[in-house]
From Swiss-Prot:
Its cofactor is Mg(2+). The gene is fbiA. HAMAP family: CofD. The keyword Magnesium applies. Gene3D superfamilies: CofD-like domain, CofD-like domains. GO terms for molecular function: LPPG:FO 2-phospho-L-lactate transferase activity; magnesium ion binding. It is an enzyme of class 2 (transferase). This is Phosphoenolpyruvate transferase. Homodimer. 7,8-didemethyl-8-hydroxy-5-deazariboflavin binds at residue 63.
Length: 332
């Protein structure tokens, strides 16, 4: 299960790096692949959502990208396997196994079993991901932001002990509580000791363009930036860094970006998110910022362009990518 991605031929196009989360990031990558089938595309994927459940290592964003690009995703839900069954979940419930709020599908379970077996055998997550992708042939290189533990936890008022605060895993905050609990902040556990996965920094530094997918700016892109060295590489790369807004008309395209932004005191607008990322000419990471045609934004030091941002299908998404690369000055 080792070796190079068989589906990635020697690149003849530009070298593109994309920072991505789960559903939105995966759909954006479909557009990148649609537009640039011969390019060297490397996706640096959020691992802040990763969690141990029932003795297995779950990597939601890596799996969503892998299944989406490999044709195995449940397109109606946007996550998990198509044709999924839930017998293992039912059996765990019969045993009163905890936690009972996080379901693992039968098909999905196989991925987690293989991943956990390889991790326990000593393989780093990046090598495990490469091995899993040999089956799915995603057409882009999927790389975890780090091989180390770097999990997003959420500081909340303890629902069971009012008046007391405690930190819970992001999955519990979102899946169990649906963010409907008094929330005080986010913490990235392990970030102080984490290192970028192999080649991540080199890929950013040698890229022709770096794109920030329209993923959650706090717990997806933000969690990637929490890995020491990645933000610095974005600030010094020779490539232009172009972000794509995941907020349209004051609402996230999907997911809970509004809930997360509220916690850190950022408005749910394209302008506010662009300012949150900031300009590379100051202390931020952006050179350019794509917003939807119905939005307006002024981000000091950042070139803002209004284009249609609804990712209805890969060809439509490819046009978003085209605009991002044009803003980056990349020709192919």
């Amino acid at each position: 299960m080792t070796g190079q991605h068989a589906d990635i031929a020697p690149a003849t196009g530009p070298r593109i790096v994309v920072l991505v989360g789960g559903v939105g990031g995966a759909r954006f990558l479909q557009g990148v692949r649609e537009l640039l089938p011969d390019a060297e595309v490397s996706a640096i994927v959020n691992v802040g959502d990763d969690v141990w459940m029932h003795g297995l290592r779950i990597c939601p964003d890596l799996d969503t990208c892998m299944y989406t690009l490999g044709g195995g995703i449940d397109t109606e839900r946007g996550w998990g396997r198509v044709g999924e069954t839930w017998h293992a979940k039912e059996e765990l419930a019969a045993y009163h196994a905890k936690p009972d709020w996080f379901g693992l599908g039968d098909r999905d379970l196989a991925t987690h079993l293989i991943r956990t077996e390889m991790l326990r055998a000593g393989y780093p997550l990046s090598a495990v991901t490469e091995a899993l992708c040999n089956r799915w042939q995603p057409g882009v290189k999927l790389i975890p932001a780090t091989d180390d533990r770097c999990e997003t936890h959420v500081v909340v008022t303890d629902p069971e002990n009012p008046g007391e605060r405690r930190a819970i895993h992001f999955q519990e905050w979102w899946v169990r509580y649906r963010a409907n609990v008094e929330t005080h902040g986010f913490a990235t556990i392990g970030a102080d000791e984490a290192k970028p996965a192999p080649n991540v920094i080199d890929l950013i530094e040698s890229a022709d363009a770096v794109l920030l997918a329209p993923s959650n700016p706090v717990v997806s892109i933000g969690a990637i930036l929490a890995v020491p060295g990645i933000r610095g590489a974005l600030r010094t790369t020779r490539a232009k860094v172009i972000g794509v807004s995941g907020v349209i008309d004051g609402k996230p395209l999907r997911g809970m970006a509004d809930e997360c932004l509220s916690v850190i005191g950022v408005e749910t607008t394209a302008e506010a998110v662009g300012r949150h990322y900031g300009a590379r000419s100051a202390t931020g990471i952006l050179d350019g910022w794509l917003i939807h045609t119905t939005d307006t934004a002024e981000v000091p030091g950042v070139e803002v362009r209004s284009v249609p941002l609804l990712m209805t299908d890969p060809p439509t998404t490819a046009e978003i990518v085209r605009e991002a690369l044009d803003l980056a000055g990349v020709k192919w």
